[in-house]
UniProtKB/Swiss-Prot annotation:
Function in brief: The RecF protein is involved in DNA metabolism; it is required for DNA replication and normal SOS inducibility. RecF binds preferentially to single-stranded, linear DNA. It also seems to bind ATP.
Subcellular locations according to the entry: Cytoplasm
Protein name per Swiss-Prot or TrEMBL: DNA replication and repair protein RecF
GO cellular component: cytoplasm
The organism's place on the tree of life at top rank: Bacteria
Gene Ontology MF terms: ATP binding; single-stranded DNA binding
Record organism: Micrococcus luteus (strain ATCC 4698 / DSM 20030 / JCM 1464 / CCM 169 / CCUG 5858 / IAM 1056 / NBRC 3333 / NCIMB 9278 / NCTC 2665 / VKM Ac-2230)
Biased composition (Basic and acidic residues): 391-404
A UniProt-annotated Pfam family: SMC_N
Residue numbers binding ATP: 30-37
UniProt keyword terms in alphabetical order: ATP-binding, Cytoplasm, DNA damage, DNA repair, DNA replication, DNA-binding, Nucleotide-binding, SOS response
Alphabetical list of HAMAP family matching this protein: RecF
Biological process, per Gene Ontology: DNA replication; DNA synthesis involved in DNA repair; double-strand break repair; SOS response
Transmembrane segments: none
Length: 404
């Protein structure tokens, strides 16, 4: 698949931008700070309705506006789909397909599949566990969009359960009524948590071999990459040739919650569940976090994203379904050998979008099509322009000020 056109309005620093794209490789070229990353973030969001950079949609809307809009024309073989997403922080996104009426947001998932690698992905190796959990959950939803509801249900129930625990902290009012209410939330938490755990473990089982192969390809096989899932739910721990059943995971989670009841009351916090879990990464026998060199960290983070790409390709073997691959400011950080190896790995994608500040950083075979991104005299960002996507987003009238 590929994206032939992208239009954004009030997204990040962009008041309005319109970009024509082609199959094959495209380099978005421009100085640091002109908005290259904002454009590829918009492409990723159009497909997943999630940013690869931030967890809050509010940060995606241009300052002073109440919504942002992204539209694109997606091609999969002979089929073309016009997809539009309106980002409304604090509310559900509005999604339209082929200029039709708005549909449920989840119906827009899967039309455009993307895999994005960006410098922020170093935190997948060096950062806190939340980033690695997010990686698993994003891939899980791309594979099975319906599981997005399980993740949302889990977060909602977790907030309610924590609120109940906090309401009884240090209070003598905790009694049979509170116990009964907590038991109800336990059931909801275990039901949603078990589905989320099952989805994550399924993703990890699919990732294991591609992760090893991609890291070996990027580093010439210097060390073996591996993982272990460290869970507060004992049945979910380790690596799994077979994923435990949802019912078994729910039973084990319920049992563990009961064992932690007094500690949870004392701390007014839910201590058991997928929100507390960790994906531990290893290079050889050593944990990657804290032990990997800078080059190894880059290679492992890249291998994680490229392995995710392989998982999506295997999920739908139709060549026309291969995700769009986005490499955001990657090549400047790689030595010549790693650049060559990465360039050799991306050829399977029908479309590769690369951002760079200097063209010489990008392997020549990936520079077939170039788009210059700049800032005009007024400070607003400008890109190569073409006709809007089916008229979905029109350039707004200027309002007296330029955007930085």
């Amino acid at each position: 698949m590929y994206l032939s056109h992208l239009t954004v309005a009030d997204f990040r620093s962009y008041r309005w931008a319109d970009l024509e794209l082609t199959p094959g490789s495209t380099v978005l070229l421009g100085a640091n700070g002109v908005g290259k990353t904002n454009l590829v973030e918009a492409i990723g969001y159009l497909g997943a309705q999630q940013s690869h950079r931030v967890s809050s949609d509010a940060q995606l809307v241009r300052f002073g506006r109440d919504r942002a809009r992204i539209a694109g024309r997606v091609h999969r073989g002979s089929r073309t789909v016009a997809l539009k997403v309106e980002i409304l922080p604090g509310r559900s996104n509005r999604v339209a397909i082929n200029r039709g009426a708005s549909v449920r947001a989840k119906e827009g998932l899967g039309i455009l599949r993307t895999v994005v690698f960006a410098p922020e992905d170093l935190s997948l190796v060096t950062g806190e566990p939340g980033g690695r959990r997010r990686l698993l959950d994003q891939l899980m939803v791309q594979l099975r969009p319906a599981l997005g509801e399980a993740a949302a249900d889990y977060e909602r129930v977790l907030r309610q359960r924590n609120a109940l625990l906090k309401s009884g902290r240090g209070s003598r009012r905790w009694g049979p009524e509170e116990d009964a209410t907590l038991a109800v939330w336990d059931e909801h938490l275990c039901a949603a948590g078990a589905r989320l755990l099952h989805g994550r473990l399924h993703v990890l089982r699919l990732l294991a071999r591609p992760l090893q192969e991609m890291y070996a390809a990027l580093t010439n096989g210097s060390k073996a990459a591996a993982y272990a899932y460290e869970s507060t739910v004992p049945l979910a721990r380790g690596t799994h040739a077979e994923v435990p059943a949802v019912a078994d995971l729910a039973t084990d989670m319920r049992r563990t919650l009961e064992a932690q009841r007094e500690e949870e009351r004392a701390r007014a916090l839910t201590l058991v569940g997928p929100h507390r879990d960790e994906l531990a990464l290893f290079l050889g026998p050593a944990p990657a976090r804290g032990y990997a060199s800078h080059g190894e960290t880059w290679s492992l983070a890249l291998a994680l994203r490229m392995a995710a790409y392989d998982v999506l390709v295997a999920d739908d073997p139709d060549p026309d379904a291969r995700p769009v691959l986005i490499l955001d400011d990657v090549f400047a950080e790689l030595d010549a050998a790693r650049r060559r190896r990465l360039a050799a790995l991306v050829h399977r994608a029908e479309q590769v979008i690369v951002t760079a500040a200097a063209l010489e950083d990008v392997p020549e075979e990936l520079t077939a099509h170039r788009v210059l991104i700049r800032q005009d005299a007024e400070g607003s960002e400008a890109v190569a322009a073409a006709a809007p996507v089916e008229g979905d987003i029109r350039e707004p009238r200027r309002e007296g000020g330029a955007d930085g």
